[in-house]
Amino acid sequence: MTETAGELDPEVTPLHLRKALGRFASGVTIVTTAECEDEDSVHGMTANAFTSVSLDPPLVLVSISTRAKMDTKIRETGTYGISILAGDQEPVSLHFAGAAHEPDRVRFVWRRGVPLLEGALVHLACTVVASHPAGDHTLHVGRVEQLWYDDGHPLVFYTGSFRSLELLGRDEPWGF
C-alpha cells in the first residue's frame, strides 16, 4: 500500500479521522423537523452522515451530534425529514450548515407533517423508531412513511468541498 497524503499516524485523532472520512464522497442532505405545520417552527441542518438501513421495513438512519439542537428537536417531535439535495442547491446547504450565505428563499413541502425542501431530488418523511447513543452522536433510525423522488444530478461533498457528479459509462440505471 502506498501513501500519498503522508505517513501513518499511530494515534487516531478526531482531526485525522475527519480528514480520512472526508475522502468518502457523499450526497448532501438537509435534516428537518417541526413542532407543527408552520414554517416558523421548522428546524433544519445540513448532514451527510445519512444511510439506508433496510428496504423492508423501509428504514434510514441519520447521525446527529449530541451537541446539536437537532438532536433534541428530533427526540421531541419523534419525526424528521431527509431532503437529498440537487446539484444547484449548494446555497441551501450552506444556509442550513450555519454559514453566512442566505439563499433567496427557502421553501418547504409538507409530507406527513414533516417539512422537506422544495427543489430537492428526494424527500423522505420519517417517524423515529429507535435512537441509539454512539459516542458524541445519536443514531436516529427512522421508518420512511412517505417518499418522493425526481431525476437530476445530486450535490456531492468530498474533502470539505462541494462537487458536481459526472456520469461515467452509460447513462442507464441498473434496473431500478
Curated annotation (Swiss-Prot):
Entry function: Catalyzes the reduction of FAD with the concomitant oxidation of NADH. NAD is the physiological electron donor. Subsequently, the reduced flavins diffuse to the oxygenase component NphA2.
GO biological process: 4-nitrophenol catabolic process; pyrimidine nucleobase catabolic process
GO MF entries: FAD binding; flavin reductase (NADH) activity; FMN binding; NAD binding; riboflavin reductase (NADPH) activity
Subunit description: Homodimer. 4-nitrophenol 2-monooxygenase complex consists of an oxygenase component NphA1 and a flavin reductase component NphA2.
Catalytic reactions of this protein: a reduced flavin + NAD(+) = an oxidized flavin + NADH + 2 H(+)
EC number: 1.5.1.36
Gene name tied to this protein: nphA2
UniProt keyword list: FAD, Flavoprotein, NAD, Oxidoreductase
pH dependence: Optimum pH is 7.5.
Protein residues bound to NAD(+): 52, 137, 157-160
Pfam families: Flavin_Reduct
Membrane spanning residue stretches: none
Identification of the protein by name: NADH-dependent flavin reductase
